[in-house]
């Protein structure tokens, strides 16, 4: 497809019933996942949640590790697990390098409501500037992940609501009727990152502290969960 010409009539449809009864996957809102994990964490007797908290220093040695918090408390452990994101301070402090690649693309993310039901169907358009993903949410709402050239993304995000929604609608098409913005829009740069190694002395890196990929396949979170 192309924004100026609308949605292409060419498409590839994946039908999960051809391989089984279950859907290919589920889309769960971040706030729901975080809420569920927080609730579960409070029920586990062998887990202590310390929040809010910031780590001041981490000292790792042959016998274990000492983690000093900003408030002065020191936690002693046999293993430090770094799950502190693609710019992981733990990875850097351990001297573990990483290979990185910038795609010169920016993801513009927003949520829209629409007149017609999406029937739980996810759609991804492949446009010249990058994929435009429409991910079904609860009710008549859809999350948009619009990949755009980094040079152009600020101009689109800087439009007023009517102008921005018009650009979204041109790409989205009218298959779900008129759209309405729900909540804020935000952006993040897209890039690849892979740590040279995942472990160090009394240290293990997981999730985006170890590996980060392009969101086109929607597997970043899944890969992080698999690490656990």
Predicted regions and their residues:
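Central beta-strand plus flanking loop segment that forms part of the substrate or channel wall
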Residues: 87-122, 132, 140-142, 148-152, ...
């Amino acid at each position: 497809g192309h924004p100026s010409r609308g949605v292409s009539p060419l498409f590839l449809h994946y039908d999960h019933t051809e391989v089984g009864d279950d859907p290919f996957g589920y889309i769960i809102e971040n706030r729901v996942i975080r809420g569920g994990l927080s609730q579960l964490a409070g029920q586990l007797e062998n887990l202590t949640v310390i929040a809010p908290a910031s780590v001041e220093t981490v000292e790792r040695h042959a016998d274990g590790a000492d983690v000093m918090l900003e408030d002065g408390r020191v936690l002693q452990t046999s293993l430090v697990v770094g799950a502190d994101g693609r710019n992981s301070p733990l990875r850097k402090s351990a001297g573990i390098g990483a290979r990185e690649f910038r795609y010169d693309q920016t993801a513009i993310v927003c949520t829209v409501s629409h007149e017609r039901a999406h029937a739980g169907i996810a759609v991804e358009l492949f446009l010249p500037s990058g994929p435009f993903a429409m991910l079904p949410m609860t009710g008549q709402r859809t999350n948009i992940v619009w990949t755009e050239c980094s040079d152009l993304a600020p101009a689109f995000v800087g439009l007023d609501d009517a102008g921005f929604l018009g650009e979204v609608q041109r790409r989205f098409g009218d298959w779900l009727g008129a759209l309405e913005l729900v909540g804020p829009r935000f952006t993040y740069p897209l890039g690849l990152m892979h740590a040279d190694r995942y472990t160090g002395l009394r240290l293990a890196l997981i999730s985006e502290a170890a590996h980060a990929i392009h969101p086109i396949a929607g597997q970043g979170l899944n890969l992080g969960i698999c690490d656990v």
